[in-house]
Amino acid sequence: MQITQGEVTLRDTRASDIEDEIRWMNTDTDWFYADTPWETLEPVDPEELRREMEGIMAGLKEDSVRWRLEIEASGRHIGLVSSYFPEGSVVRALGIEICEKEFRGRGIGAAALTAFMEYYRRFGEDRFLLETWSGNERMLGCARKLGFAEVKRTEGAYTVDGKKADAILLEKVYGETEGR
């Protein structure tokens, strides 16, 4: 499966992506700490991750609804989009990681999330959530640009560098007047 939005392509995982994933999980981890700086990313066993990703690829059927797609820009694998249903929710939450630094701040995240939402809209979904924290200015700016609105704030949910930070839940609801 492949979806293109401007210079961004969302696509299924390929074997050539595995080494990037290993690097992002073990050495080039700054993307993780921008997203969840209060957590610690434990290094992964490369062989274990390789087997896990190969299993995911092997089990993927053409008609399966995707929960994860890789992001490619300028012909390069740079990150991923994913989705999940938060506990007790029937509304899909979206996630995005631009793991390659030089591709951040260029609108690629907004294009990737737009393409991902359009993919799910084909299945009748018109509401989406994003979960982030008050210090993630890049994600908050992207969310606002895409029309997400804050629906819940939990003050002091996280401690980052000794300071309290808020958990923020944002939602986008496509309206009757927006194109499908």
Go through each PLM region and give its residues.
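Conserved catalytic-core motifs of GNAT/GCN5-like acyltransferases
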Residues: 129-132, 149-166
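Acetyl-CoA-dependent GNAT
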Residues: 42-103, 173-177
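Conserved active-site tyrosine of GNAT-family acetyltransferases
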Residues: 143, 148, 170
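Conserved acetyl-CoA-binding loop-helix of GNAT-fold acetyltransferases
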Residues: 105-119, 137, 141-145
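Conserved beta-strand-loop-alpha-helix junction that forms the acyl-donor binding cleft
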Residues: 99, 130-140
